[in-house]
Amino acid sequence: MPEPCARDKLLIVDDEAAIVRLFKIILSSSLPGTVVDTAQNGKEAVEAFERNRHATLLMDLHMPVMDGRQAFQKIKEICKENDWVMPSVIFCTGYAPPEWVNAAMAANPAHRMLNKPVSSSTLIETVRGRM
């Protein structure tokens, strides 16, 4: 049976520092007891996930170094190789979701899509429902 992720850990991944700060403030205050980590790109997200096994990732799609799709695929590979449960991934973008996001959500109902700008209440409700 696959080993579960750390249910009390959340990873926010976005290359826009202001969004990361805002999301961290909102979610830290709304989800007491949750460890909220951050990453600025997909490469940092993969490294943070390998170290901390976050149960939920809130991830932008368009980032430098490694984009959301590449990070998602790498995390999926890591989970398969290590027999870990795949974390819930909440994709977050200001653009129309690409087909691969729709396919990922169809394959795993724990994954979700949020369109930027997103209200605080929707953000909190969506993340809380995945933790």
Across the structure, where does each feature detected by a protein language model lie?
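Short, conserved "switch-loop" micro-motifs in signal-transduction and mechanochemical regulators
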Residues: 94-96
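Helix N-cap/capping motif at the beta->alpha junctions
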Residues: 24, 38-47, 68-71
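Two-component/phosphorelay signaling modules centered on CheY-like receiver
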Residues: 17-37, 108
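Non-catalytic signal-transmission and effector/linker regions of two-component phosphorelay proteins
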Residues: 1-11, 17-18, 24, 82-83, ...
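A Lys-centered signature of the CheY-like receiver
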Residues: 115-116
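Conserved sequence signature across two-component system core domains
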Residues: 13-14, 39, 57
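Receiver (REC) domain active-site loop signature in two-component systems and cognate sites
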Residues: 63-66
